[in-house]
Amino acid sequence: METVKENKKQSPQRKSAADPQRKKSSFEDQFEKLDLNIHGVRLPEFTIEKEYLSLIDNPEKIKNTYDFLIALCQKGFKKLDLKKGSKKHKKYTDRIYYELDILKNLGFVDYILLVWKVIYFCKQKDIPVGLGRGSAAGSFILFLLGVTKIDSVKHDLFFERFVSKIRAKKKEVDGITYLDGSLMCDIDMDVCYYRRKEVLKYLEEEFSGKTSKIRTLNTLSGKLVIKECGKIVEDKPEVEMNRISGMIPKVFGQVKDIKETYEEVDDFKDWCDKNPKTFKTALKLRGLVKNKGVHPSAILLSYDQIVESCPIELDSDKDKISAYNMDWASIFNVKLDVLGLRTVSVVDQACKLIGIDVEDIDLEHKSIYQNLYDLKRPQGIFQVEADTNFRVCQKVKPKNLEELSAVLALGRPGALTFVDQYASYTNDDVYEPIHPLFDEILKSTGGVALYQEQLMQMAHKIGFTLDEAEVLRRIVGKKKIKEVKKWKKKIREKV
C-alpha cells in the first residue's frame, strides 16, 4: 500500500517471498485454461418475417438476407423514376452494384438490415426519425432503404467514408462469419427524444437478453486536476486556480498533458515550481477515473446472451449496462447508435401543426435564407443558434443549402480562419485558387477545403485509390500527427 501511496516502483526486496519460478509456472497453468479463442463479432441473425416479405415484389424468390436487401433496393430505386438507358440511370445503378458487392464481401448485409429493421419499426409506430447524418449519408443503399433521406450520388458523397475495403476486416471460422467490431461501419439513428425508450424496449423484446447500454468512464483532465489539487492541497483561491488551469492549452480539441505544459509554458512552470505539492499530487491523479456514466446513444447487440460476452451492471431502473467501455465492448458485440434528439421532436411537431410533410419542404426556397438574413436571435435553429455559427452565418449570408452547409463547416475551430475568404467568394465572387489540379474540387467552396470529402477527392486526383483516401481522411480527422507526417512523403511521391 505504501508503494501505491508514494507512486513508486516496487523494489525486488518488497516482492512476494514466494518462489518466482513457481508463481510463473502457476500463472502459465491458469493461462492455458483460459478460452481466448476470440474471433470477433458474430452478427445477430436477421429474420425475414412475413410482414417484411409483403413489402417487396416476387417474395418467393428470396432465399437469403442478401436477396432481401437487393429486393428492398429495387423497391426504393423504382421510386426515383429514372429513365432507363439514361446517363443518370446508369450512374445510379453502377453505384448500387458497387455498394452491394462491398457490403456482401465484407459481411455487412445483416448489419444493414438490422438498422433498417429499427427504422422500419419507428415508421410503423409513427416515431419521428432524423434524415441521416455522418458517414452513413455516403451510402446510396441506405437512401434507397429509407434509413437516410440523403441522395449520396446527387451530393457527391463517398461510400468509402461509410465502408472501406481497407479498413473493414472479416474472417470465416467453421462456416461462421466474424467481423472486427472496432472497424465496422457506423450508422447514427436519430429518433424522437420523447419516444427513444420505445425503440430500446423494442430492441430488448426482439433480442431478449442480448442487449445492453454501454458504460463510460470520465477521467480527470489536466485542467481539472491542477485546479482541484490547488484548492484542496494548498488551499488556493478559486480565482488563482482558474488562471493557472487556463494556462493549459488544448491541442486539436484535447487538453494538453500537465507534464508537457510544464515543459513548454514558462508561466505554468514557474507557478508549479513555487507550489510543488499541488503539481506532484496532480501528476499522480491525472488520467484517473473521476466518475462513470452511460453512453448517450450506444446500444450493444450480441449474438448470444449479452452476459456471455460482457460483465453486466444494473442501473437504478434495472437496465443492463456493460461494465466494459465502448472500445472493449465492440470487440465482441455489434454497436447500434440510437440517439434521442429534441430537434427531431420539435421539427415533427411543427410540421404536424402546420400540416406539411418534412420531406416535401423545398430546401432551396428563398424565404428560408431571407429569414436567416433578418434573424436577430437564432435560438431554436439547430446548429445556427451557436454563437460562432450565427456570426459566420451573418458574414457569409447563405443563399442556398450548399452555402448554409458551408456556414456550419466554417464554424469549426480549424476552419474559422477561412471565414473571410469564403465570405468574399459568396458575396463578391472572389475565388482564390490553390492549384489548377484542384480547381474543380474546391470551386464550390471558394478555394477552401471545407469538407473531408474534398480531401478524399484531392487525394484521389493525385493517384490514390478512394480506399487509400479514406485512410488519409481518418488520420487527419483523428489528428494523428505522426501518421500525417508519413503521408506527406507518400503525397510528394505521387505529385
Please place each PLM-identified region on the residue numbering:
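Alpha-helical scaffold/interaction cores of sigma-54-like transcription cofactors
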Residues: 1-9, 14, 19-495
